[in-house]
Every structure is written in C-alpha cells, then in structure tokens.
Amino acid sequence: MKLNKYIDHTLLKPEATKEQIEKVIEEAKEYDFASVCVNPTWVKLAAEGLSGSDVKVCTVIGFPLGATTPEVKAFETKNAIENGADEIDMVINIGALKSGNLDLLERDIQAVVEASGEKLVKVIIETCLLTDQEKVLACQVSQKAGADFVKTSTGFSTGGATVEDVALMRQTVGPDMGVKASGGARSYDDAQAFIKAGATRIGASSGVAIMKGETASGNY
C-alpha cells in the first residue's frame, strides 16, 4: 500500500475555521489520502467537498475525553453517519477501564459499533494515560466488542503515539485488526517507523509534510 493511503489527514483543533477545513479537504484530494478526519460539526462540509473522490470522511465521537455515556456516543455516531461520515474514531471510557469496569467499557464500544452499521470503527484508547496492562486490556475489549481498529491517541492529552505502543497493540490484536497511530507522526521517517511497528493507519495533521519528506511542527 502506498504511504498516502495510510494517512488520515486530520484537523481536530477546536478553533479550526471553515477555510482551514476546506484547505485540508483540498489537500486530501490532491494527495489521495485515506481520509479526512474532522470534528462532527464539519462532517457535512467534508462529505460535500470529498464527493466523487476516494477519500473517506472520518470523524470523532466522545472526543477528546471519552467520558460521555454509551447512549450519547451512539447518538453522536448515528448523527455523524447521517451527515456523511464513513469512519468513526471513538474515545473509550478511560475511567471505566481504570476502575476495572470492563463490562461498561465493552458496552461503551459496542454501542458505537452497533450504531455505526457497516461503517469502520476505530477505538481510541489514549495510551499516554494507561499502563501497559491497561493498553492490552483496552485492545482486547475493543476486539471483543467488534471494532475494526484500535487507535493510540486523541492528540489532545499528555502524549501521542509511540513506536513501542503501536508494537504492543499490534502484538495484542494480531494480524486481523487495524492499528492506528496518531499524535506523533510529523515526518516521513516517523510514519515509516509506525508502519514497521504494525500501524495500518496514521492520523496526522502533518500529512502533506510527510508526503513531501519534510518535518512538521504540532502535536497531532
């Protein structure tokens, strides 16, 4: 697979303007990225802008804290799909995981999986807040709940993806589930390191810099 098709071209900062979102959409079409990842308020604009292209519309649910209820996440998911979303990146209930409430954690993920129908679901586990044991548990529960991907990070917490976390996640889920590295790829070399570790998708605001072989600044 070509590098461009690993990249979810991402703009999730709360202050993003319509003009900035439109720029990301145009860049994604130019480089034929896997998707554009935007907040739910921009999904309709992205769907219109990407109509007729191969670039998917990705959005985020329960973002960035993951601390809403399963019912709210399910509603958000359905609303996003009605507006044109093809892929759903949800944040887990991190507190449930930390409290050992794996039933709630699974129900949280399942609610989004069921609401998404046939759409792709990626589960953000926020690795920077977890122990290695919790990372493994989060991946196992995501897999059991029927998600398509596990994803490292929101890009809005204390840290982003590391090669070590990607490798651990890949080792945990095996070959049949996607692993998305986000919040750490700022250069071509970063992207290649994540792919080598087992990532099948990379979330980055630096997609253009990565494709040009440059290094970008920023935290996502």
Curated annotation (Swiss-Prot):
GO terms for biological process: 2-deoxyribose 1-phosphate catabolic process; carbohydrate catabolic process; deoxyribonucleotide catabolic process. SMART domains: DeoC. The active site is at 89 (proton donor/acceptor), 151 (schiff-base intermediate with acetaldehyde), 180 (proton donor/acceptor). Pfam families: DeoC. SUPFAM superfamilies: Aldolase. It catalyses: 2-deoxy-D-ribose 5-phosphate = D-glyceraldehyde 3-phosphate + acetaldehyde. GO terms for molecular function: deoxyribose-phosphate aldolase activity. Its main location: cytoplasm. Keywords: Cytoplasm, Lyase, Schiff base. Catalyzes a reversible aldol reaction between acetaldehyde and D-glyceraldehyde 3-phosphate to generate 2-deoxy-D-ribose 5-phosphate. Belongs to the DeoC/FbaB aldolase family. DeoC type 1 subfamily. Its EC number is 4.1.2.4. InterPro entries: Aldolase_TIM, DeoC, DeoC/FbaB/LacD_aldolase, DeoC_typeI. This is Deoxyribose-phosphate aldolase.
